[in-house]
UniProtKB/Swiss-Prot annotation:
It comes from Mesoplasma florum (strain ATCC 33453 / NBRC 100688 / NCTC 11704 / L1) (Acholeplasma florum). This is Glycerol-3-phosphate dehydrogenase [NAD(P)+]. Its EC number is 1.1.1.94. Keywords: Cytoplasm, Lipid biosynthesis, Lipid metabolism, NAD, NADP, Nucleotide-binding, Oxidoreductase, Phospholipid biosynthesis, Phospholipid metabolism. The gene is gpsA. Its main location: cytoplasm.
Length: 334
């Protein structure tokens, strides 16, 4: 397959990991960042030490703090910024883009304003411009440092057509990074968002030394409620049983590398979610997701007993022990 000109918006850990994969596949990769020190770190020292210390990345990766330069001849554009920054970034992309591009989103979350899918909101941001050729979303169990270390990883790419998804698989996939194609954007997106809230519950159970049986119960109930939620948006069951669903859930809800999991542990340590959040300096996506998912569930009358417990712990001053006391109650499986 011919080389692609690929732009990654953001110089975060995951964007850097994807840049390394794509550069390993002989694509032309440029990253756009706003922190000059990071841009220099990538260009001069071939590393992103903010996230990966002195670990080297592919020497062909370039970085710039000029959006115009980043979009000079882009075929594929990857949105590697947090959900809250997307609207501002899209405005700049529309301003400087030279041609229509395949847009791939990696941000996780739900649409708070419209109580819907993030993908619908992002596509709406691009409306009226000639910038977006196709829209895709990339999700799955892929801790950034392991991808940079070229450890075996498998994720999913969801596109509007299976042909486009397969084409993008060929761009990304190699001997250590496998990408599976699907058209279920809704299923991938919902899985990526909701598993973060479930991971908070995983950390809570771990901190109480609840054992593997309870943890397996949590994963089972969480996965079922993810699917119940997803059905409302037309998501497919098979997606929740694949890398973006079950795979990412197992990883995020079981690993101390997950910020959401660590927050759950911290909540138990302080016995107070508000105090835990105040002491936690990192962005934890599952907190906002739990609130928005709750609002969507109420609006559309989606039964989500497990998510209600997480929501009440985070927002209604319910003590974390309530998860342990209630996780086995009102069990409803697909």
């Amino acid at each position: 397959m011919s080389k692609k000109n690929i732009t990654i918006i953001g110089t975060g850990a995951y964007g850097t990991a994807l840049a390394n994969v794509l550069a390993d596949n002989d694509n032309n990769v440029i990253m756009y960042g706003i922190v000059e020190q990071q841009v220099d770190d990538i260009n001069i020292y071939h590393q992103n030490s903010v996230f990966f210390d002195n670990k080297k990345i592919n020497k062909t990766i370039r970085a710039t703090n000029s959006m115009a330069a980043a979009l000079e001849n882009t075929d594929i554009l990857i949105l590697g910024v947090p959900t809250a920054a997307i609207k501002h970034v899209v405005n700049d992309i529309i301003k400087y883009a030279k041609k229509p591009m395949d847009i791939i989103n990696t941000a996780k979350g739900l649409d708070e304003e419209n109580l819907g899918l993030l993908s619908d909101k992002i596509k709406k941001y691009f409306e009226g411009s000639n910038v977006i050729s196709t829209y895709s979303a990339l999700y799955g169990p892929s801790i950034a440092i392991e991808v940079v270390d070229r450890q075996p990883t498998a994720i999913m790419i969801a596109s509007e057509t299976i042909e486009k998804a397969k084409e993008l698989c060929n761009v990304f996939s190699n001997e250590y990074f496998y990408m599976y194609p699907t058209t279920d954007i809704a299923g991938c997106e919902i899985s990526a968002a909701l598993k973060n809230a479930i991971a908070i519950g995983g950390g809570i159970l771990k901190a109480y030394n609840a054992g593997d049986n309870a943890h397996a119960t949590l994963l089972t109930l969480g996965l079922n409620e993810m699917y119940e939620f997803g059905k409302h948006f037309g998501a497919k069951l098979e997606t929740f049983l694949n890398f973006a669903g079950l795979g990412d859930l197992i990883l995020t809800a079981s690993s101390k590398k997950s910020r959401n999991f660590r927050l759950g542990e911290r909540i138990v340590e302080l016995n107070d979610a508000k105090k835990a959040l105040e002491s936690f300096n990192l962005t934890v996506e599952g907190v906002e997701t739990a609130r928005i998912a709750h609002e969507i569930g109420v609006k559309y009358q989606i039964s989500m007993n497990f998510f209600e417990i997480i929501y009440n712990i985070l927002y209604n001053n319910v003590k974390p022990i309530s998860l342990l006391n209630n996780v086995f109650r009102d069990v409803k499986l697909v």
